[in-house]
A protein has these predicted regions:
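Two-component/phosphorelay signaling modules centered on CheY-like receiver
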Residues: 11-36
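Acidic, metal-coordinating helix/loop segments flanking the phosphotransfer/catalytic sites
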Residues: 31-49, 57
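C-terminal output helix
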Residues: 87, 107-120
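The C-terminal output helix
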Residues: 117-131
Length: 132
Protein backbone atom coordinates (compact mmCIF):
# COMPACT_ATOMS: atom_id res chain seq x y z
CA UNK A 1 0.00 0.00 0.00
CA UNK A 2 1.32 3.44 -0.92
CA UNK A 3 2.40 5.73 1.90
CA UNK A 4 0.01 8.62 2.47
CA UNK A 5 1.45 12.14 2.22
CA UNK A 6 -0.53 15.26 3.11
CA UNK A 7 0.38 18.69 1.79
CA UNK A 8 -1.05 21.82 3.38
CA UNK A 9 -0.29 24.76 1.09
CA UNK A 10 -2.53 27.76 0.39
CA UNK A 11 -1.05 28.59 -3.02
CA UNK A 12 -3.05 26.46 -5.49
CA UNK A 13 -0.28 26.29 -8.11
CA UNK A 14 2.38 25.22 -5.62
CA UNK A 15 -0.03 22.77 -4.00
CA UNK A 16 -0.80 21.18 -7.38
CA UNK A 17 2.88 21.02 -8.36
CA UNK A 18 3.90 19.38 -5.08
CA UNK A 19 0.99 16.93 -5.18
CA UNK A 20 1.72 15.95 -8.78
CA UNK A 21 5.45 15.47 -8.21
CA UNK A 22 4.98 13.46 -5.02
CA UNK A 23 2.26 11.24 -6.49
CA UNK A 24 4.57 10.47 -9.43
CA UNK A 25 6.98 8.99 -6.87
CA UNK A 26 4.31 6.44 -5.93
CA UNK A 27 2.80 8.11 -2.87
CA UNK A 28 -0.88 8.66 -2.20
CA UNK A 29 -1.29 12.43 -1.81
CA UNK A 30 -3.95 14.51 -0.10
CA UNK A 31 -3.66 18.26 -0.64
CA UNK A 32 -5.32 20.93 1.46
CA UNK A 33 -5.49 24.70 1.05
CA UNK A 34 -6.18 25.73 4.64
CA UNK A 35 -5.74 24.67 8.25
CA UNK A 36 -9.49 24.05 8.64
CA UNK A 37 -9.65 21.95 5.47
CA UNK A 38 -6.63 19.93 6.59
CA UNK A 39 -8.05 19.28 10.06
CA UNK A 40 -11.25 18.01 8.49
CA UNK A 41 -9.25 15.64 6.29
CA UNK A 42 -7.10 14.50 9.22
CA UNK A 43 -10.22 13.71 11.23
CA UNK A 44 -11.00 11.07 8.61
CA UNK A 45 -7.45 9.67 8.38
CA UNK A 46 -3.98 10.72 9.46
CA UNK A 47 -1.29 10.53 6.77
CA UNK A 48 2.12 8.88 7.12
CA UNK A 49 3.88 12.24 6.66
CA UNK A 50 2.73 15.87 6.52
CA UNK A 51 4.21 18.83 4.64
CA UNK A 52 3.11 22.18 6.07
CA UNK A 53 3.39 25.73 4.92
CA UNK A 54 3.33 28.11 7.89
CA UNK A 55 1.33 31.00 6.46
CA UNK A 56 -2.04 29.76 5.23
CA UNK A 57 -4.19 32.55 3.87
CA UNK A 58 -4.71 35.17 6.57
CA UNK A 59 -3.43 32.85 9.32
CA UNK A 60 0.24 33.76 9.69
CA UNK A 61 1.04 30.90 12.09
CA UNK A 62 -1.48 28.31 10.88
CA UNK A 63 1.21 25.75 10.07
CA UNK A 64 2.64 26.00 13.57
CA UNK A 65 -0.86 25.54 15.03
CA UNK A 66 -1.52 22.58 12.77
CA UNK A 67 1.78 20.97 13.75
CA UNK A 68 0.85 21.22 17.45
CA UNK A 69 -2.57 19.70 16.81
CA UNK A 70 -1.22 16.86 14.66
CA UNK A 71 1.55 15.90 17.06
CA UNK A 72 -0.92 15.92 19.96
CA UNK A 73 -2.82 13.22 18.04
CA UNK A 74 0.21 11.29 16.77
CA UNK A 75 3.53 12.23 18.45
CA UNK A 76 5.64 10.20 15.99
CA UNK A 77 4.13 11.69 12.83
CA UNK A 78 6.87 13.05 10.54
CA UNK A 79 6.21 16.73 9.84
CA UNK A 80 8.12 18.86 7.33
CA UNK A 81 7.74 22.62 7.23
CA UNK A 82 8.10 23.90 3.66
CA UNK A 83 7.91 27.67 3.78
CA UNK A 84 9.18 31.06 2.74
CA UNK A 85 9.59 31.99 6.41
CA UNK A 86 13.29 31.34 6.75
CA UNK A 87 14.30 33.47 9.73
CA UNK A 88 16.25 31.48 12.28
CA UNK A 89 13.62 32.08 14.96
CA UNK A 90 10.98 30.47 12.72
CA UNK A 91 13.22 27.47 12.05
CA UNK A 92 13.89 27.06 15.77
CA UNK A 93 10.18 27.38 16.55
CA UNK A 94 9.25 24.77 13.97
CA UNK A 95 11.83 22.28 15.16
CA UNK A 96 10.94 22.85 18.81
CA UNK A 97 7.32 22.09 17.98
CA UNK A 98 8.48 18.66 16.82
CA UNK A 99 8.93 19.02 13.07
CA UNK A 100 11.39 16.58 11.56
CA UNK A 101 12.64 19.07 8.98
CA UNK A 102 12.33 22.72 8.01
CA UNK A 103 12.86 23.43 4.33
CA UNK A 104 12.95 26.80 2.56
CA UNK A 105 11.01 27.66 -0.57
CA UNK A 106 11.76 27.48 -3.37
CA UNK A 107 12.85 23.85 -3.38
CA UNK A 108 13.43 21.38 -6.17
CA UNK A 109 10.77 18.72 -6.39
CA UNK A 110 13.44 16.00 -6.60
CA UNK A 111 15.01 17.14 -3.32
CA UNK A 112 11.62 17.31 -1.62
CA UNK A 113 10.82 13.77 -2.80
CA UNK A 114 14.14 12.50 -1.41
CA UNK A 115 13.53 14.16 1.97
CA UNK A 116 10.11 12.51 2.12
CA UNK A 117 11.60 9.13 1.27
CA UNK A 118 14.38 9.53 3.82
CA UNK A 119 12.07 10.56 6.66
CA UNK A 120 9.67 7.72 5.92
CA UNK A 121 12.58 5.24 6.06
CA UNK A 122 13.70 6.68 9.39
CA UNK A 123 10.18 6.46 10.78
CA UNK A 124 9.79 2.89 9.56
CA UNK A 125 13.08 1.92 11.23
CA UNK A 126 11.92 3.58 14.46
CA UNK A 127 8.67 1.63 14.32
CA UNK A 128 10.51 -1.67 13.79
CA UNK A 129 12.91 -1.09 16.66
CA UNK A 130 10.31 0.36 19.00
CA UNK A 131 12.28 3.58 19.45
CA UNK A 132 10.07 6.53 20.36
Amino acid sequence: MAKRIAIVEDDPDQRANYADAISKKGYSVSAYGSRVEALSGFDAELPDLVILDIILGEEIDAGFQLCRELLAREPNLPVIFLTERIDEIDKISGLRLGAWDYLPKPITLDYLAERISSLLRINEARDKTGVQ
